[in-house]
Amino acid sequence: MSINIEQAIIHEISQDSQGQLRCRLRPQPLLNSQAVEMMLEELHQTYTSKSGKGFGYFGIHGDDGEANPAFSNALQEYRAGDLGFVEFTGQASKLLQEELAKYDFSQGGFLLMSCYTSMASDFLFVALLSAKSSMTVLDDMELSQNNHLDLSNIQLAARIDLTEWQADKDSRKYISFIRGRAGRKVADFFLDFMGCVEGVNTKAQNKTLMNAVEDFVASSDLTKEERQQCRNKVFEYCSERFDEGADIEIKDLADELADQGMESFYDFARGGSYELDEEFPADKSTLRQLKKFSGTGGGVTISFDGGHLGQRVIYDPISDTLLIKGVPANLKDQLDRRLKGE
C-alpha cells in the first residue's frame, strides 16, 4: 500500500421524513480491515490523480470574511491529544449538517474521514460520499439490487496536509480540494464547513510557468529540436511531481534543465516579471500544452504533438489554415471510404 492508515470513520447525514437533516454517528473508528484498506487506497489514488484541484488554507474569521474556525479548532485539539478521533469527527459531522441545512438542494451522504501517512506526510482526508445503485446475480441466478459507495466518482472531497499545516503557518496551500465540472470549484458548503479559503491559483501559476519556459527557449540559442526537448523535460518533471502529489519546485526544475545543458532557467524565471512562487502544485492539464497543441470549435477537434509544428503540420496565420502532411491511417481510411461512397 502507498498509505499507512492511522484511523478512519464514516458518519451518515440524511433527511428524515420531515425533510430535516439528521446525523447518525458511528461510535467507534472503522476496523483496519482489508475492505477499509482497499477503499482508502482506491480513494487516495483517485484523489491524487484528479487534475485541476484547488488549494487553500484555514481562514481567519474577520480577515477572511465569515470563515468558521470551529473545524480547525477541533482539528487542533485532536492533533494535540485533547480530543479523541471519534469526538473530533462527530463535531465535524455536526458542522457539516449545520452547513448543509442552509441549502434546499442537500440530501446528505456518508461523511468519510481518515488520517493516514503518505510520502512522510500526515494527511486528513475528508469526503462526502454518495450511494449508487447496482445489480448483482445471486447464487440461484436471480438478480438483486443493492447500493454501494460510489468511490470512482468523488466530487466532494478535500485533503489536509497536516504536516505542512503545523510546520508552516503561513502556507496557503495545505488544503487541496476537488473542483466541480466546467471549472467550478467544489460546492461552497463543503469548503465553508471546514472554514477553508482558496489561497493559490494553481492554473495561473502553471500558465505563468509555461509562459516563462516559452520565453526562455525563445531567448536561447537552442535549436528547434532542443527547444522541444526543453518543453518535454519540463512537462515530464511536472508530471512526475503531480503523480507523486508533490509541488513543483522552481529551483529543482532549473537543476533538472541544467543537467540537460540548459543553464540559468532559475535566474531567468525569478528575474523576470513572472511572479512565480518558489513552490506550487502542478496542473497537468495546463502544462500539457508544452507537448501538445489542441483545440475544438465549430465541430472540429484537432490535437497534435508540438514537435510536428512546422514539419507535418504547417500553420499559416495569414490564411488561417492548417496543412497536415501524412494523414493518420485510420482517419485516411474513413475519408477515403466516404469519398468513394459519394
UniProtKB/Swiss-Prot annotation:
Record PANTHER family: NUCLEOID-ASSOCIATED PROTEIN YEJK, PTHR38772
Family from the record: Belongs to the YejK family.
Organism: Shewanella sp. (strain MR-4)
Name the UniProt record assigns to this protein: Nucleoid-associated protein Shewmr4_2217
GO terms for cellular component: bacterial nucleoid; cytoplasm
GO molecular function: double-stranded DNA binding; single-stranded RNA binding
UniProt subcellular location: Cytoplasm, Nucleoid
Keywords for the protein's UniProt record, in alphabetical order: Cytoplasm
InterPro entries on file: Nucleoid_associated_NdpA (IPR007358)
